Amino acid sequence: YNFLNDAGEVDGFEREVGDELCARAELTCEWVTNEWDSIIPNLTSGNYDTIIAGMSITDEREEVIDFSQNYFPPAASAYAAKSADADLKGGIVAAQTSTIQAGYVAESGATLLEFATYDETVAAVNNGEADAVFADKDALVPTVEESGGEMVFVGDDVPLGGGIGLGLRESDTELKAKFDTAIQSMKDDGSLNKLIIKWFGEGAKTF
C-alpha cells in the first residue's frame, strides 16, 4: 500500500490516492511516517490528522477513531506456509500485531505469534518459528511468487473487515466529510479503480 522510495519519500498506492484526495478536498497535506503499533494513539493525541496506511475498518478500531468510507474494497486474507499440509487450526500462526488478521488467528484456536512487521511474520515461517503466516493476500502474493516454491498458499481465502479507509479523530467530522466526498468522486469517475489496477494488477478487486 505504501513504502519509502530511494529518496526517502512516502510512495505507492496510498501516496497517489492521498495526494489526489487532498487536491480534490482542497487541503494542503504533509506526509509523515509513524510506527504501526503507535499509529492510532498518535492520531488521537494530535501528532497528525489522518491515517492512510492500509488500515482495515473494524468495529474494534471504530470504538477509538472514525473512518472515512473505504478507498480499497474488503481484501481477502490468506494463509501461506512451507507445505500444503501445515496445521492452520492447531499450529502456530504468525500475524502482524494489532491487525484484523491477528484477531482472527487468536479466535481460530491456533497459537498466535505476533510480530511488529509483515516481513517478520514471513521470516518466522521461513525459520521454523511458525507453521504458517496469515496476512493480506495482496501482500502474500508477491512473497509466495518470489519464494521459488518455498512457500505455498494453504486453505481458503478469508474475507475480513470493511475495506481500508482513512483513520480520523472522532471529533474531526468536517475533515471526515471532506475526505468522504473526495473518495466518492474518485469512485464515481473511475480514477480510484485505475490506481488500484496500477498498483495491484488486473486481478485486484475494484469498486
PLM features: residue spans?
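Ligand-binding cleft/hinge of the Venus flytrap
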Residues: 1-7, 18-27, 96-118, 122, ...
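Short helix-initiation/N-cap motifs at beta->coil->alpha
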Residues: 15-16, 30-42, 97-99, 113-127, ...
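Extended ligand-binding regions for polar small-molecule ligands
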Residues: 15-24, 96-100, 163-203
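Flexible hinge/capping segments at coil-to-helix
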Residues: 76-94
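Ligand-binding clefts/hinges and TM-proximal coupling segments of bilobed small-molecule sensing domains
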Residues: 103-120, 153-154, 183-207
